[in-house]
Structures are given as C-alpha cells and as structure tokens.
Amino acid sequence: MRQSGNEQEVIILGSGLGGLAAGTLLSKNNRSVLLLREKRYQPSYPTQGYHFVPFSNFSEKRIGPSFLKKISNALNLQLLMGNREEVKQTRISSDQSKQKAAFQVVLPKSRIDIFPQRSLSQKEWKREFPKEFIEIEKFYDELNQTQHLLQKVDRKKNASSFFPLRKHSLISGLFPFDSLPKGKMDEKLSPFSRAFREFIQLQLISWGNLFSERFPVPLAGHIFSSETDALSIDVDLEKLEKEIVSEFLRSGGRIEEIDKVKKINLGWRKGFTLSLEGDPRVFQSKFLIFNSPLHQISSLLGKKGKELLKWGEKIRPLYVMIPLFLGVREKVIPVGMKDLLVSMLDLDKPYDNGNVLFLSLSPKGDETKAPEGRRALTVESMMDVGKWEETLLVDYQQEVMKHLYHIIPFLEHYTEFVDFQWASDHVPNWSYSHFLYKVTSDFYWREGVVPVKMSKNIYFVGKENFPYLGLEGEIFSGLSAAQEILKNESWPNFIRP
C-alpha cells in the first residue's frame, strides 16, 4: 500500500548499507518507505582531483564475487549481476587474483601478506615465524576443519547461505546440540608468540568492527574464510551503495535530507511521529528502522526507548576511527606494499594514538581516484571515544604521520597534501559510523549482539548487530529487518541463491 506526503509505512533513520538494503527490499514489495539522510554528512570526499572514501574495515574495500552475487540476488541488482560474458570474466579475474594478496599485516619486525591460496600463505608464515611454523600449520588446520564443519551443519539444517545464522529458541537454549568447537581464540593463541597473536588479532578486527580477545573459534574460521574470498573485482562500497540507492528510488522509495531528529513520539494508533530540529516538517510511520550508531540515537525515544538503552549497554564504542587523507606521488610507494594494509608500530602499546593504522591506496593508474602518477591514500587511525572533544587534531596528526613515515620512507618529500578537515567536520555527526566496538558480556555469534527487532514495530540495523562481520553483517541485518516487517514466516528465503 502506497501513501503520500509525510505519512508512510516505514521510516528509516540513517543511510547506511543496512538501511538501504532494508528500504530497497520493502519498496520492491510495494511498501511506502522514507529514508531520512543527514544533510551535513557526505560519505566521500573529492578534492584537488582526488577521491577519498573513509572506511570502517577492509570488507568495505574488497567485496568478494560470492558475496556480491548474494546481494545482487537479494535485491535484484541487474548491473551487479551482469551478463554471462561478464560473469565469465569475473571468474577469470578471480582465478588470477588467487595469486595476489588480499591485504598485508605489518608488525615491528614482520610484513606478512594474506593470500587466498594456502600454499602462498605458508611461505609467509615460514619466513616471518620460523620457530612456530609447525604449530601455526596445526592452528590453521583446526580453523579450516571448524569452517568445514560449520558448512556441513548448515547444509543439514538448510540454513541461509548468506550467513550461518542460528535462530534462538527455548529448546536450543536448554539443549544446545551444536557440534561446533566451544573454545575461544585467546585460549588457542596462548602458546604462540606475542607477534603471532597480534597478527591474528589484527586480521580479525580488519574485517569487522569488534575488538575482543575472546573471539569464538568458529567465528574466527568464518572471518578468515571471508577474507580469502574477498578477491579484487571492480566493485567497492561506494559503487555498491550507488547501485542500491538507484534501485531503492526506482522501486518507489523516497529520500529526504534533514539536520537532526529532535524527538520521536510513539502514539497508540498513529505509530511514530518524528519532529526535527530547526525544521517544521513532521514525519509519521507505522514502522521505524534505526540505521545510525546505537549510542547516537538511544535517547530519541525518551522513556519508551528502554530497549535501545539496554542494548547500548551491551555493546559500546571503544575507539572512533579517524580518517586522514593524503595525496601522494606513485614513486614513493615501496615495492611490495599492498593497496590494503594494517600496521602496528609497538606491540606493547594500545591501538590508539596512531599505534595501529589501516591504509587503503587507490588502485594504481585509476584516474577516477587520483591524478596521473598519483595515489589517494586513506589512513584510518583510532582514538579513545571519550577523548575526541579534548584532543588537538594537530598533535594527533603528528603521531599518525610518525607511524606513516615508518611504513613509507621519504613520504614527506612525495606528499601533495594532508587533509584532516573532513574528519573534523564529520566525526561529530550522528550518521558517522566508523567505530571499533567492545561487548560487555558474552554473546552467541550466530545470533548477533544486538537484535534486529527491538520492540513492536521498532528495528535496529547497523554495525552493532553483527559487529564482527563487517559489510556482510550490515547487509544481512537490513534484509532481516525488511523480512520481519513483511511478516514472511520463512527465514529469510530471499537470500538463498
């Protein structure tokens, strides 16, 4: 049923990938959907012939062909599915990409490439961790066996191929006949050196947004499998987002830009009424989907938002990720440096204050991202969430640059510009979603941390649902929310191939 004006069936507050996926699926099923997007927030930054896109994790930079196929099937994105010849070329490209590193991990005394092929990775482990090589082989064998077991269990249960979800039930809670290993990664890694433990930990947080020393072993196996599947094809987060927005609008969805929601009132019959700051417009809907960081919107419902506050206590942002943009000359990039890289300068220090950096280089020769002979370098560092207001960005930038000079010698002589202005302008916004989270209690990784359905007609879609899964978790949450609203009894059929 379509409605007009400022009354609609569903309002989505925020414009992340999860919300866009939910809105597109709902619109395709003839539901009236309004997406409210923050006017001041720009997800990318074009300047001086360069094009920068801040990111939360590497899953936003490398979208694997199998994952892309699932999204395309779920939302019927024809431009992403392509014709037979394009699919054939993608398979050829994927085969060639198996010889290329997905990304690179840099430690004080090590530089390790992550390859899709086990034989290539073995050479890396043997070179950088020769004394532990035999035990490392056994460690990866166990992870592979766990992943195969997970796939076997889900095939028997006819589970969703999008993500190995386990639906919660009273019976499964009382009698958890789950044959997957119950161990945690800190226990598995305890015999290894500090360097190898950090090597594994950095990989786990590089693909998602959760910091934890106690990752469940099956979850680690799933994440490593996703990393090696993410072979380089010509689709990144920005391109995917544009295609989903186009499909959302084609299906009848609407987008309005706002400054900020002032208050949300919940009426017994009329549903939700949203009033805005500095704007006379009022929006009403039956269903409400929050698609902004939980800690940014938990107070909007006042006393009726107890569920938001409760789950906001279970998962909290530990670090805010701060982007720094550099225009650099191609000749300064070291031989062997990959386009995606995570680096830790000091193993004995925390991750913040420039000690851990995530780097993303624009593809060599891509003049849509940087002028000829130049590269766009996006650097994500971490800052304690509580220190943003009191930190001088000039001093903070110096710490980040010291680390960068260590990774890229002579960088200061080949840098066109360094830009921190986008971060200064955008980090305070309610749409800013680049955080590394921590959980305050145990969770079932196959059920998620924060539920998609908060209470009657209120849904939450964001990184906090499945913070360890990166882009996969966001898309899955959005599609799940839409499926709940559509009241389809099956779970969720639309994401099967």
State the predicted function of each range.
Residues 107, 229-232, 262-372:
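Mid-domain catalytic core of redox enzymes
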Residues 144-251, 258, 435-441:
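Active-site/ligand-binding neighborhood in enzyme catalytic cores
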Residues 80-82, 254-256, 416, 459:
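General small-molecule cofactor/ligand-binding pocket signal
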Residues 2-148:
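N-terminal glycine-rich phosphate/pyrophosphate-binding loop and immediately adjacent elements
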Residues 463-489:
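A conserved FAD-binding loop/helix module that cradles the flavin
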Residues 37, 83, 241, 257-259, ...:
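Short loop/edge segments at beta-strand edges and connector loops
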Residues 197-207, 410-468:
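A glycine-rich dinucleotide-binding beta-alpha-beta segment and adjacent secondary-structure elements
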Residues 329-425:
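C-terminal segments that line or cap access tunnels to active or ligand-binding sites in enzymes
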